[in-house]
């Protein structure tokens, strides 16, 4: 399968009513594309890092009533799961595609990672372009450009609030050429991940488990 992009019909998946119906569309339309894109990303990250990385595709298994408003793939250094580990995500809401370096609330070392990031704030500001965005909740669409964000406040919240999260990356609007053209999309993913790789590696020095 050639590198796929995501079309209008893929985004319309999130307009389908009913958990089973929406999940059926996610499995048939979106997850095969995630498999191809994710395998490419997994292999490239394994080469860049010199460690085996693993692809995970969100199954939304905990849901019993409400259908998911977004779906994603994740690449992490752990074979069994990704939520307790720093990881990269590529996924869709109904109006945009996101590429994240994600630190979500299940991460046991999030306090140490936040502390390390606060101590290395100048590095973050140097490495991450100002038009990249930060989210403090992976379940919400909202994200703020780094240039408009109080970085210290967001990292202190990540450190101090049990359910707080910190994700950094890029958004691309549905219908954009980058999203619909598979080669362009993969190049955008590569560029984003390479840009954020120093932060991923820094998080590992804070005691985050990789296996």
Curated annotation (Swiss-Prot):
A Pfam family in this protein? DUF1054
**Superkingdom, natural source:** Bacteria
Q: Which family, according to the similarity comment?
A: Belongs to the UPF0637 family.
Return the protein name: UPF0637 protein ABC2405
